[in-house]
């Protein structure tokens, strides 16, 4: 139970940043940045590189929200030392505002960068943006949609701290389950078009 709590304490800023970024992307703030990252580029196969849903607003938004969420979470944890001790990164690094600014921004960057290959592959397989595959790929991509960004966060964390295979697997399983639950809440709040 303690190890599950440690994983959640470590991942919480990324989870919060993802929710805040979804709200931000649906808002009218900075609409000028709501432009596709691929600028409408169509490759030789006649398909878009990433599609309309991968925007600069979402890309930079996740980096900024990641930094802000990490800072706020770190300040909260400072007031609860028993929880702060469980944070996997703070076992190796001091919990400072500057450190958390960088950590949160880089986790946000890892999150959005590792979503891009998934979008690229889905466009090749003619899976529409923001939709679930309706063919034999359905369950494969439901799973990949939940873990692609988590893989990015794990790889990034490995540059900072040692993670056991159990911790990495725990991040994927807990993160995927949490991602599905949060997606449902965002769907019910009409911030997301797809339940998965």
Where are each of the predicted segments found?
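Interhelical loop and helix-boundary elements at the membrane-water interface
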Residues: 1-152, 161-196
């Amino acid at each position: 139970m303690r190890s599950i709590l440690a994983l959640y304490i470590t991942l919480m800023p990324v989870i919060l940043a993802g929710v805040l970024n979804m709200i931000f992307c649906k808002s009218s703030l900075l609409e000028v940045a709501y432009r596709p990252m691929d600028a409408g580029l169509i490759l030789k196969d006649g398909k878009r590189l990433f599609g309309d849903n991968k925007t600069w607003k979402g890309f930079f938004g996740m980096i900024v929200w990641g930094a802000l969420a990490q800072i706020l979470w770190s300040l909260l944890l400072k007031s609860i030392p028993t929880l702060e001790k469980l944070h996997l990164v703070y076992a190796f690094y001091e919990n400072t505002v500057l450190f958390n600014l960088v950590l949160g921004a880089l986790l946000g960057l890892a999150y959005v960068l590792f979503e891009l290959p998934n979008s690229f592959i889905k466009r090749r397989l003619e899976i529409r943006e923001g939709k679930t595959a309706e063919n034999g790929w359905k369950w494969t991509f439901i799973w990949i949609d939940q873990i692609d960004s988590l893989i990015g966060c794990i790889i990034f964390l490995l540059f900072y701290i040692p993670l056991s295979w159990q911790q990495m697997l725990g991040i994927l399983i807990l993160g995927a389950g949490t991602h599905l639950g949060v997606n449902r809440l965002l769907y019910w709040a009409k911030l997301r078009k797809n339940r998965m």
